[in-house]
Amino acid sequence: MEALGPGGDRASPASSTSSLDLWHLSMRADSAYSSFSAASGGPEPRTQSPGTDLLPYLDWDYVRVVWGGPGPAPPDAALCTSPRPRPAVAARSGPQPTEVPGTPGPLNRQATPLLYALAAEAEAAAQAAEPPSPPASRAAYRQRLQGAQRRVLRETSFQRKELRMSLPARLRPTVPARPPATHPRSASLSHPGGEGEPARSRAPAPGTAGRGPLANQQRKWCFSEPGKLDRVGRGGGPARECLGEACSSSGLPGPEPLEFQHPALAKFEDHEVGWLPETQPQGSMNLDSGSLKLGDAFRPASRSRSASGEVLGSWGGSGGTIPIVQAVPQGAETPRPLFQTKLSRFLPQKEAAVMYPAELPQSSPADSEQRVSETCIVPAWLPSLPDEVFLEEAPLVRMRSPPDPHASQGPPASVHASDQPYGTGLGQRTGQVTVPTEYPLHECPGTAGADDCWQGVNGSVGISRPTSHTPTGTANDNIPTIDPTGLTTNPPTAAESDLLKPVPADALGLSGNDTPGPSHNTALARGTGQPGSRPTWPSQCLEELVQELARLDPSLCDPLASQPSPEPPLGLLDGLIPLAEVRAAMRPACGEAGEEAASTFEPGSYQFSFTQLLPAPREETRLENPATHPVLDQPCGQGLPAPNNSIQGKKVELAARLQKMLQDLHTEQERLQGEAQAWARRQAALEAAVRQACAPQELERFSRFMADLERVLGLLLLLGSRLARVRRALARAASDSDPDEQASLLQRLRLLQRQEEDAKELKEHVARRERAVREVLVRALPVEELRVYCALLAGKAAVLAQQRNLDERIRLLQDQLDAIRDDLGHHAPSPSPARPPGTCPPVQPPFPLLLT
């Protein structure tokens, strides 16, 4: 049995049998069975050699074990004439040749069962002593493959320690290399003392970009805090604290890290940015990603803020007003303003000549009447504005003139708002436009009964009151018509007159004789929120206080000059709900309040100019502690005492007045919430009537439409307020801010205009659903219920629009109050405004809260 033991070598089945030692074993096995062969009377028939066809469980491993062995071959094995085993192909094909009896042959289970069993035992022993099996080698292969994968991932994964997004070389755009020339730094506008900063000698090497706290802060803003993307590329603090100061604090092009030029940084959150020309300061430009208010810790006192909260170019200093100067490298052509460069291709020649005159006339009568203080106002057009969407008026580009060093330092002759209520005193003005008793209604596609339903709603909600629209000009036809959403066009035609919104008479900021008084101080645009519009502070005393503070502390000029539109942005609702119906729904509450206080304002129309928010001049300046602020008890018309001549005293007085105005705005907000609850009860009653008159499927369609209508109205109003905010900021930043901010505002405007196109499709879809619901209600409900339905749609839109506008006013007023408190040193967050006694906190409104 030693010959059947496992061998050290693995022989091929087709190899020679010279090393096999089965001679004696085969002879003994054959002799043991020879008796059976002899008894049969004939020679034993030869069977076919074992193969996979006859014995599929036999493979060549078995043959290797049976024919293999460690023992040396006998000397006469080479002379043996026994045939060698054939390959697998030969074993499977054809009959085998006859072999000489007595020689060892292939094993057969039927012929030699004992030898077959012994060979099986030898095979089992050989398998037990074999090296590692194939599964072990497969596991080793998997380990090697995993190691290779780890190496590949380590080479191609995102390097978080660098915090930089890299693009492949084939996709990376080539950035033009800037010459490493020394750029002299002029006096920084953010440092009124005029201290120059040392010039940097060369641009940073490509491999060393992004080192230091500046790049780390930038990466933190870009990747960790996307909401602070507005600060990338703009100044707003000391040197190396804000990114704009690292390159240039006053518009100077200078060396900057490589991250500023990296395209992936500018494309963060799908915000694609086109880089500015080489003669203008380069930097990252971003879009609005939510809140536009920057942290107060990064806003110095000498920086200005626009209406939307962005940091504007510094133009004020301790020595007075500093004109904006853009330095240009030697040999480079003096660049035009970015606003002119960007918009010149959108403007006709006539409007471009008006927007960019060669020299502003200083002695013309029209200029002297339009000019307030040192502010020059010229009309402008916005880029790529769809005429079929906005039938409003173009913004006014305010161009500041250098301050007059010989200007009088005394109290200025201010131009204040008229104390006449809205709708009174307009009959004496030329160019008055009066709408007849019944409003012209929009014709919506639908059934005849549906159109009659819209026209019949006038008798149920009280639209029969006459309305006076704002005249297109003053007695001298010098002041253009102001529209609250921020656009100016030519005088409207008769077909477009119903789309224009009424504006209060005092929004023009004229006194009783319609003649603006001369002033040598910078006038603040208040009231309508339009850039360059006349100030409409509640009283002359408050206006003089604001102008005096703006003269003493120019850093407060822009925060106090910002003002949202006095009327909700209803332009995007046109086509969904008739605007005349929406405005009429604002008027019933206006009539009730007007009977009580006819000389103040109309809250329902929501076109108040803060006149109603303050009591008499003596009462509005009174505080709880007269000893602490004794100056506030003095009448506004008299001169201020000596303690209040300081800047701090004036700021305290203005903060007290703004706090009172904020409390009154919260009171108005509670009134709107009560009105919203009343409309919700009307909707529930109407839904009960629809449940009784219509099928369950139609009732479900009506309920879904009313819920979707509130959401769509909120989105449209939010988009309209953002568009108006960006246009106001763009008009204010047209001439006195850096090009980076202007480009950012233009980009944001284009993004909002694309969203406006999407909103138009959504509005058309909801309008189709409204027409389908109205057709069902016309067949099922009586005329009175149809009027209630039409009034409900207009009332919901009116309440939502007023809530949106009131939120804008409260937020802006709170920002102004925070800015004054920061200057006073109160860095702690301001507490919630105190509410009048007997009032409770506002409850959850029945309408969904509008997005901010």
UniProtKB/Swiss-Prot annotation:
GO terms for biological process: actin filament bundle assembly; cell morphogenesis. The modification Phosphoserine is found at S18, S133, S137, S166, S190, S224. One of its GO terms (cellular component) is apical junction complex. Residues 125-144, 301-313 have a biased composition (Low complexity). Disulfide bonds: none annotated. Residues 34-54, 81-109, 125-218, 276-320, 399-431, 464-496, 823-852 are annotated as: Disordered. Residues 543-825 form the ASD2 domain. It is found in: Cytoplasm, Cytoskeleton. Coiled coil: none annotated. Residues 152-164 have a biased composition (Basic and acidic residues). The modification Phosphothreonine is found at T103. InterPro entries: ASD1_dom, ASD2_dom, Shroom_fam. Keywords: Acetylation, Actin-binding, Cytoplasm, Cytoskeleton, Microtubule, Phosphoprotein. The modification N-acetylmethionine is found at M1. The keyword Acetylation applies. GO terms for molecular function: actin filament binding; myosin II binding. Residues 279-289, 465-479 have a biased composition (Polar residues). Residues 145-233 form the ASD1 domain. The keyword Cytoplasm applies. Residues 830-852 have a biased composition (Pro residues). Belongs to the shroom family. May be involved in the assembly of microtubule arrays during cell elongation. Interacts with F-actin. The ASD1 domain mediates F-actin binding. This is Protein Shroom1. It comes from Homo sapiens (Human).
